[in-house]
Amino acid sequence: MTAPSVSAISAYRQLLRATRIAFKDDYRILLAARSEARKQFNAHKRTAVDTPMQIQHALETASILRHNIVQGIRDAEKEDAKWELRIHDEIERGDNDSVKIGGKNVKIEKACS
């Protein structure tokens, strides 16, 4: 195997792990996300000039899935049911003030609730 194919395999595995974390217990979405990942990787099987960019895209997608996607569930039987968010350990936490600051260093003085 060449080096790009080894890193492509690694990126694919990271993407599958990220889908497992982001879409835990939501099998319909999990299967759809994995199917899309497989389809994209199969569409770009041959090593080309843009292969490193595609591998980087897969790694960035895995990072977004792992750190920024939160799923919510609601009891469908109750009309006034509240949403429960499934926030796992790897979810990026912050507050609105840190978003407004941009690229500057942020000191968070209180825990997010």
UniProtKB/Swiss-Prot annotation:
Compartments, as annotated in UniProt: Mitochondrion matrix
Pfam families, alphabetized: Complex1_LYR
GO BP terms in the entry: mitochondrial respiratory chain complex III assembly
UniProt GO molecular function: protein folding chaperone
GO cellular component: mitochondrial matrix
Disulfide bond residue pairs: none
InterPro entries on file: Complex1_LYR_dom, Complex1_LYR_LYRM7, MZM1/LYRM7
Record's keyword annotation contains Transferase: no
CDD domains for the chain: Complex1_LYR_LYRM7
Keywords, comma-separated and alphabetical: Chaperone, Mitochondrion, Transit peptide
UniProt function note: Assembly factor required for Rieske Fe-S protein RIP1 incorporation into the cytochrome b-c1 (CIII) complex. Functions as a chaperone, binding to this subunit within the mitochondrial matrix and stabilizing it prior to its translocation and insertion into the late CIII dimeric intermediate within the mitochondrial inner membrane. Modulates the mitochondrial matrix zinc pool.
The family this protein is said to belong to: Belongs to the complex I LYR family. MZM1 subfamily.
Quaternary structure (record): Interacts with RIP1.
Protein name per Swiss-Prot or TrEMBL: Mitochondrial zinc maintenance protein 1, mitochondrial
UniProt organism field: Talaromyces marneffei (strain ATCC 18224 / CBS 334.59 / QM 7333) (Penicillium marneffei)
